[in-house]
Amino acid sequence: MWTAWCVAALSVAAVCGIRQDTTTVLRVTKDVLGDAISGTIQKSDAFRSALREVPVGVGGVPYNDFHVREPPPKYTNGRQLGGNYKYGHIEANDNTAQLGGKYRYGEILDSDGSLRDLRHEDYRPSDSAYHRGPGRYRSAADPSSAGRLHRRELRPGEIPAGVATGALGPGGLLGTGGILANEGILAGQGGLLGGGGLLGDGGLLGGGGVLGVLGEGGILSTVQGITGLRIVELTLPRVSVRLLPGVGVYLSLYTRVAINGKSLIGFLDIAVEVNITAKVRLTMDRTGYPRLVIERCDTLLGGIKVKLLRGLLPNLVDNLVNRVLANVLPDLLCPIVDVVLGLVNDQLGLVDSLVPLGILGSVQYTFSSLPLVTGEFLELDLNTLVGEAGGDLIDYPLGRPAMLPRPQMPELPPMGDNTNSQLAISANFLSSVLTMLQKQGALDIDITDGMFEDLPPLTTSTLGALIPKVFQQYPESRPLTIRIQVPNPPTVTLQKDKALVKVFATSEVVVSQPNDVETTICLIDVDTDLLASFSVEGDKLMIDAKLDKTSLNLRTSNVGNFDVFILEMLVEKIFDLAFMPAMNAILGSGVPLPKILNIDFSNADIDVLEDLLVLST
């Protein structure tokens, strides 16, 4: 019931954006977060899972762009026979006219503006184009038009128009944009011999071509040039963290990777240094838990060493390996970082666990707001829920009017230069713990004669020596019972170097009659001031209280009025030697501290400040 209530309350507050009360604040530096990530990596199998075959050969989709995978485009950017082209066509769409303007495969521009299909020897005037079958002639200006001018006989010395205006003219065989001229099929950009053409730089047979195996951009320097990659060793990474104010963290993991593989020129042993970098945002999910989420992940390669077991050209292989690994390692290593951060997120979620508070209650820490990231520390605001064993929630301060606001969490002091973590516990939280003990009756105690050796005999004779009327009513010595009860919740006040606990108690003096009938002699109100000291054992805050002073007030008496001051020394001794040991025994179970990021507070420096108890490591 208690767990269900906490989860429900937390979920409602988180979804509705309600800021819960903060009773505990944890600050950690980047070193603590880095140690938590390193410890998670060492304890998990996340990095060992990378010892497997590396998937290559599909060109690789960047880890950060995995969501934009698309089918292959209809138009490619290969330049085997020109610029952009349709499969089965030679078509220039970028003003690089290999055979003139736009044309189909096998066509050439004639002097009259029509296109000749060179795949067929017979050609006839355009007026009969429609009778020659499809695809023989068409107009360059109008693809739907098939007409050509009728050819006439040439006079002696006359240059044919097809040569003057075609072969030598613009768009002709040798003219600007022609088949052999600049920008033509042989020399133009994207042409047969031009840049990106069949034989040109980057072309089919040129430098970087598919058959230029040893050239830059050849098959050896493509993903297909290396196969069978397998990661055989991955060292535990060296983790470094940089805080990004208002965002999260910048994570860097430096590791060494050993890879085996094969290339066209031999077997490979590859050793590479990898720096995995990730921008991580600190968010809060709908259930109120903080989450570290990768926004971008990259791998930076350095110090690549390639050993060829059989083969030549190591420099060429170095370049190939560098490109291949830069393409595939992000897909392999970045998901591992995501898994590691998921495990760290699980550690953050452990703070929400329900922890027993002795046998009488439990404590649960919940996140009250989105964590704060500054350039110096990460701050986590926690709300502490204290519950009774029966399931009721302790809502401190009890007994106060509901309209009175709770005291706000004070500002934390600056972190010291050598401080990595700082846990601030409010006086409200400590009061809630004592309130739970009070409601369970754990602070109530009955003290009888002989229970504590250091106390004087608790009899009517001892009391009668101080109050004569007691001796008169009970001339025969009878045993007494001192019944101490704490009807109201104690309060904790924290001041500079001083922790004060105020406990209001009632002390009822009861005499036991021979027939087991109990008679009350008097009822005294006792206001006590206790001085508290703190220590840490394991993952618990230990509280030890010491009696400082008492103040008595006689509420009722069955032996007449008397000056209660005469009982002050006796009552103070009873509280010091009986009540305080019993209370400290209850407090001895300790107060559970938040379990988060594997922080060890056992050797923490403890400072008592105004309304704050601060543990620093």
Swiss-Prot record:
Residues bearing glycans: N275
Gene Ontology cellular component list: cytoplasm; extracellular region
Domain of life, per lineage: Eukaryota
Compartments where located: Secreted; Cytoplasm
Matching Gene3D superfamilies: Bactericidal permeability-increasing protein, domain 1 (3.15.10.10), Bactericidal permeability-increasing protein, domain 2 (3.15.20.10)
Region Disordered, annotated ranges: 124-149
Cysteine disulfide partners in this protein: C297-C334
InterPro entries linked: Bactericidal_perm-incr_a/b_dom, BPI_fold-BPI/LBP, Lipid-bd_serum_glycop_C, Lipid-bd_serum_glycop_N
A single GO molecular function term of this UniProt record: lipid binding
Signal peptide start-end: 1-17
Tissue expression summary: Highly expressed in olfactory mucosa but undetectable in thymus, kidney, lung, brain, spleen and liver.
The entry's keywords: Cytoplasm, Disulfide bond, Glycoprotein, Secreted, Signal
Pfam families listed in its UniProt record: LBP_BPI_CETP, LBP_BPI_CETP_C
Family under the similarity heading: Belongs to the BPI/LBP/Plunc superfamily. BPI/LBP family.
Stated role: May have the capacity to recognize and bind specific classes of odorants. May act as a carrier molecule, transporting odorants across the mucus layer to access receptor sites. May serve as a primary defense mechanism by recognizing and removing potentially harmful odorants or pathogenic microorganisms from the mucosa or clearing excess odorant from mucus to enable new odorant stimuli to be received.
Protein name from the UniProt record: BPI fold-containing family B member 4
Organism: Rattus norvegicus
Phylogenetic lineage: Eukaryota, Metazoa, Chordata, Craniata, Vertebrata
